[in-house]
């Protein structure tokens, strides 16, 4: 269409493969107050599998998807969970691996969020710590943790803002306070 400007509105969802959608849903509900939007693929349905699905999703031959669920967590992108009917290829990515290796939850009270994360079955890699450089501020903090199945997530807060360097093209998106 001539003259039409195509604009990206933002990140719609983030996909994550988990060993059990029911267990992952319970974890995200307990840790972050997640709400179920809907199931794309339900366990009672025929698994998503075959050449067409493998091609569309870039899956290895023989991989099947038995359950897909969308979760809403606060005012951010939807989290899309995948449960395979076959064994996953490998362990979750780490920061030292190429590819999407973590996502962060903006929290208002990092101590309380850390406790809730651990009570839900997650494990923190360290205690919450101050942020550095442009993100430094007396009340700004972050901490990384692992979900019960080993995926890396971050809890972060920067109520003192970010000191954007000269030439910064855009402020980072921050979920609005409810």
Residues of each region from the PLM?
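Short, solvent-exposed beta-strand edge segments and adjacent coil->beta transition regions
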Residues: 9-13, 98-102, 140
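A short acidic/small-residue loop/turn micro-motif
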Residues: 44, 86, 159-162
